[in-house]
């Protein structure tokens, strides 16, 4: 396929063509209070009570809203824990509307990993590491739900275990900017910061070598959205009348999805790379319900 043909195909799919710009815009909107990065102050206005769709630390000085995973842990770990209709409804609503499109287009930490993976150098496939996919579901159940709910202090409150002990985004967006702007915070940094910074450094290195290791193996938010991939309104649709079975789509998929057989696999982040690779234009986005037989979403 010539470069002209590729450009013509991508122009028909603006979401795919402008994905990088959409990710940048989403990150900016999620962290709109840029001056706070230099002041070392966390925005705490009324909007902060609302969750953003992607993984974005509440403690980031620039953060527009709350991280949904952090907010969920705060409710689960509360001494007055009640079923959180708002946050659970938030997950269900976005999951049904978009699925893991949020991971592919709207998540700041996902974009950060994408940028790291663009650094020139040898890259490695994760195709043989597929069992590690299930680790993120274990982390969701254990660190986001069970530990905050059952490991509590004398007041009956649990820590946000995932945020406190695992999440590298908290160090990248929260601890580092706050420490750079506040000498008091710098002097208070201890072993926990060192441990979390080591996790961040590890995922920076892994993201250069592998595509989105945090999204694939660790992220509990991605685990939640993945549960809705097969039922979300936004889907990847394969026209089997056009498909020639070349498997180019599956070979370019960095999330290790067999696009032809399972286009809406839980790991699919709707990035659109399969659409760009398809020589017959057999793959497209579809929004809503479809009874067409050619849309094989099994």
Positions of PLM-derived features:
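Non-ligating segments of multi-cofactor redox enzymes
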Residues: 1-260, 266-298
